[in-house]
């Protein structure tokens, strides 16, 4: 409730603070003439112009009067930095604050966005370099495969070597195949010594244990009777 009373007490002060809002009947007659403007002024106001300070670095591009105050709105400090002289700054600021920014006769001409153009060209160049490197790598890989076609064939042939060897009859008669280990069985002690050429090898030790109860049976081979 107290807040509402405070707001109601502030209404007269607010109405006195905006005297231009109260228009008389005479001022309402010329309201249409003040609101609408000509076609040329409207087109000039809505027309898009490329500013010099758009998309570039002001550290490398020094500012001047055309850039700071004509192409854009500047303040007194920026104007003083441009003119350096206090008298010239005051004279310019009096005219600038009254008339606003003014453009030259050639100010309406379209400007070229140099930085945007350079950015597009640099991006296109980077893409071309990347695609060129990829194409070079693919060409080198393909050429290496064409120059060495035997390596893969030898590798495949080594993997799939047949285990069955076919020989001609005369070769088999001259050099018969050695018997396999499964057919020949285990070699005897003398054969093992002869194969390894280790004659100094002592015979295996006797079996530890009692041999009195064992008998040696000799099998005699007899020819069958006719």
UniProtKB/Swiss-Prot annotation:
One of its GO terms (cellular component) is endoplasmic reticulum-Golgi intermediate compartment membrane. Disulfide bonds join 69-74. Keywords: Cell membrane, Cleavage on pair of basic residues, Disulfide bond, Gamma-carboxyglutamic acid, Membrane, Phosphoprotein, Signal, Transmembrane, Transmembrane helix. Residues 1-17 form the signal peptide. Widely expressed with highest levels in kidney. Residues 135-226 are cytoplasmic. It is a single-pass type I membrane protein. The keyword Protease does not apply. This is Transmembrane gamma-carboxyglutamic acid protein 4. The lineage of its organism: Eukaryota, Metazoa, Chordata, Craniata, Vertebrata.
